[in-house]
């Protein structure tokens, strides 16, 4: 199965999604960990991406594994009423009480990342299935998608 097919098999509802105000011209899927410096740096540029019509779809990839503190923090975001705001707060270093719901997709998304060859975060996958390991500035991602 290609990366594009693997991503298509994941319900968008199971991702934490930041959508453009206007037309969505393309999307990127990002395997993320709230405790990762470069994930935090990329997250601060989400508005630059959405302003260009790029939807950012986050998938959980706790670098320490599914039993780590990072996994608990990711679950806290995924289980929140306001997933976007909670994820943003956690990436900004805000300490929030752990909220771990039974049906969270953290383990499944971590396994998907491993199956796709993710070895670190952030790992960005374009809509065409191209894997871009590591942090890239928003402008570079816009150019990579041909939307500059």
Question: What function would you assign to each model-found segment?
Answer:
Residues 65-142:
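Thiol/selenol-based redox catalytic cores and closely related redox-interacting motifs
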């Amino acid at each position: 199965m290609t990366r594009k097919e693997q991503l298509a098999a994941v319900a968008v509802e199971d991702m934490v999604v930041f959508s453009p105000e206007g037309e969505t011209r393309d999307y990127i899927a990002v395997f993320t960990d709230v405790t990762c410096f470069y994930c935090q740096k990329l997250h601060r540029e989400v508005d630059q991406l959405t302003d260009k019509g790029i939807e950012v779809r986050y998938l959980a990839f706790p670098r320490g594994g599914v039993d780590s503190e990072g996994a608990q923090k990711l679950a806290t975001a995924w289980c929140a009423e306001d997933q976007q705001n909670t994820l943003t707060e956690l990436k900004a270093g805000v300490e929030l009480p752990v909220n771990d719901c039974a049906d969270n997709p953290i383990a499944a998304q971590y396994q998907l990342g491993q199956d796709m060859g993710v070895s670190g975060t952030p790992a960005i996958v374009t809509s065409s299935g191209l894997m871009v390991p590591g942090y890239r500035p928003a402008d570079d991602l816009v150019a990579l998608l041909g939307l500059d």
